[in-house]
A protein has these predicted regions:
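Hydrophobic "anchor" residues on beta-strands that sit immediately upstream
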Residues: 26-29, 109, 146
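NTP-dependent small-molecule kinase module
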Residues: 2, 8-20, 45, 158-240
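ATP-dependent small-molecule kinase phosphotransfer cores
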Residues: 53-135
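Walker A (P-loop) phosphate-binding motif
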Residues: 17-46
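Conserved beta-strand scaffold positions in the cores of enzyme catalytic domains, especially
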Residues: 55-57, 146-148, 204-209
């Protein structure tokens, strides 16, 4: 497909996100690793391109600022979970937020393979407060639709450990990873519940929950129908 992954789009810090008009669409896929997010994003991208829309796929990558700070013995001692979260949020604004805003200005459809929910869930899993983490990322471009791939911790743990070498599949490692996955899942569920109550997630974006254990083709249809409502005028139905 012509849609490409942007992993390091150049930042433009001179322009503020808040002052930019929105013309494109931002659709994000969230959920645990191995839940089918990438397949959903790729499928929607191909479907949109067949309808003449310009599509760009972005992937939420680990923060380069935090990685460099963690590798430097001089800064490592000061790299608390809160400091790391602040660095990661600033990095995300420059690497992801500003370039996404520019693409929305150009009437492109931006599909994000993980976005703010993932960042928030990771910070909460490291022991930070949910509201604090939500506020940290609320200035990112607001998604027009969040596709939440809802699964269970047990299946996610099995998928993850199955891809690891035998040396890291010990009971202790599995238990520690399981606790992390459970914290991530609890945060995803809390954000989904906030959306259901209209409480912000940190945005007032519609959320479509996709059951990862359901038929993939059925999930793909649900996702396409939700996206179709955003890109096609009311009543202008086209074949799937």
């Amino acid at each position: 497909m012509a849609a490409r992954y942007d992993r390091g789009m150049p930042p433009d810090p001179a322009q503020a996100l808040e002052s930019r008009p929105r013309r494109g669409l931002l659709i994000v896929a969230e959920g645990l690793d191995g839940s089918g997010k990438s397949a959903t994003v790729e499928g929607i991208g191909r479907w949109l391109e067949r309808r003449g829309r310009k599509v760009r796929i972005v992937a939420w990558e680990p923060s380069e600022l935090v990685t460099r700070a963690a590798a430097d013995p001089r800064s490592r001692t000061a790299l608390t979970a809160r400091v790391a979260a602040l660095l990661a949020a600033a990095d995300a604004q420059h690497r992801i937020g500003l370039p996404v805003a520019r693409r929305l200005e150009r009437d492109e459809v931006v599909l994000a393979d993980r976005y703010g929910w993932t960042a928030i869930a990771r910070e909460v899993a490291r022991g930070l407060e949910l509201d604090w983490a939500v506020n940290l990322h609320q200035s990112l471009p607001v998604p027009d639709l969040i596709l939440y791939h809802r699964g269970d911790a047990g299946s996610a743990i099995e998928r993850a450990l199955a891809t690891r070498p035998p040396s890291v599949r010990s009971a202790a490692v599995g238990a520690a990873y399981g606790q992390l996955v459970e914290r991530l899942l609890a945060t995803f569920e809390a954000l989904a519940e906030r959306s259901r109550r209209g409480a912000g997630t940190p945005w007032s974006s519609p959320v479509l929950a996709l059951d990862v254990h359901a038929d993939p083709a059925a999930n793909a249809r649900l996702a396409r129908d939700a996206v179709r409502a955003l890109v096609e005028p009311s009543g202008a139905r086209r074949p799937a």
